[in-house]
Amino acid sequence: TKVKSSKKFDYIIIGGGIVGLSTALKLQEADKKVLILEKEKSVALHQSGRNSGVLHSGIYYKPNSFKSNLCIRGRELMLEFLNDNNVPYRLEGKIVVDQDMNNIESLYERSQLLEMSGVKILQETELLDKEPNSKILQGLFVPQAGVVDYKSVAQTMSGIFQDNGGEIEYFQEIVGITEKKDQKTVSSKKDSFTADFLINCAGLFSDKVAKLDGLHPKVKIIPFRGEYYEIRSQKNHLLNNMIYPIADPDLPFLGIHLTKTVDGRIEAGPNAVLAFAREGYTWSKFNLSQTLETISYKGMVKLGRKYIKTGLDEMYRSLNKSAFVKEVNRLIPDIKSEDLVKRPAGVRAQAVSENGELLDDFLFEEGNKSLHVLNAPSPAATASLAIGEYISSKVLN
């Protein structure tokens, strides 16, 4: 490989998703010379551009975890960023629902612990005021939640980063990382680049990049596809904002929810189906070596045993539209199968440990002159600027 530029950078960031871009902006604020290497033709083509577009409140996550702290801080920073850069968003809150009142009450107690103002338990009549077409009897209203298009957020970030002298190199799939004389050299199939420090924000491939850097991560990224449907526009009046079920405490996925997007469409989803490729956006996208790697991983074998029924249920819902509709009807009864139109799916990069745990919190691992983001599923988009702040404070010291 030829050395692409004799220019030396302070930092190389692998991955032009929203976490990589946020980190780049924070390092740039400290006057650092930053290069982003992205394997695609533009930024935010994977997780950052294929998600529910929710600005999360932080209410779901264990207090004082990375997810909780960085989501709450990140939401503040994100709102500031959206306002400063005229990126459209809506902040009209969401309703969290559960059959079991105890779950709603414990979530309410957590909101009080986190000093979230305006969160309240709604009974049937108040719920019908907010969502007259739902069939929910009880729920929690969380005013801090909103919606935004994270792909346009990422594109805005990329514009600012480059206007301020930052560089992004596209079509750079990383094949090697070496180190000599305190320098990191990162090689793609066609070029190599040098910097003082490396930051891995490679999302679905973050564990592989960590291995190239000589780390032995105790987790593997397992890809879970999340499929979405859009409700036909004639039925757009059926939802005002967002309705979410309370997550299964054992699974880090939030379950099928209904969201009114920034541009006024209603989306239903996502489910969570094991994907047969790291970028397996459809059933037909199959990568043999990646699939063998997934199913032979001892953590996956243990996980599979534990969640075989859940996994089969999710697959059934993916292959059987009426099963998906049934889930949606638990929230809003008037939506029929013919009202649902397929949307592009997303794939979540979910870290799974060797003992079969789905890692619930964000995970960062330090290497020699490197830092690796090894688990950044939802709410990482909401938290992105706070993750960037956290990473830059670690690497600048």
What are these regions (language model features)?
Residues 303-397:
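C-terminal catalytic lobe of FAD-dependent flavoproteins
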Residues 53-126, 136, 255-256, 265-267, ...:
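Dinucleotide-binding Rossmann-like beta1-alpha1 core, especially the glycine-rich loop
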Residues 28-50:
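Glycine-rich FAD pyrophosphate-binding loop
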Residues 22, 177-287:
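Flavin-dependent oxidoreductases
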Residues 140-197, 201, 205-208, 383-394:
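Helical element adjacent to the flavin cofactor pocket in flavoenzyme catalytic cores
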Residues 61, 88-98, 124-164, 183-189, ...:
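Helix-loop-beta segment of a Rossmann-like dinucleotide-binding subdomain
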Residues 216-218, 235-236, 261-345:
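Flavin-binding catalytic cores
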Residues 9-36:
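N-terminal Rossmann-like FAD-binding beta1-loop-alpha1 element of flavoenzymes
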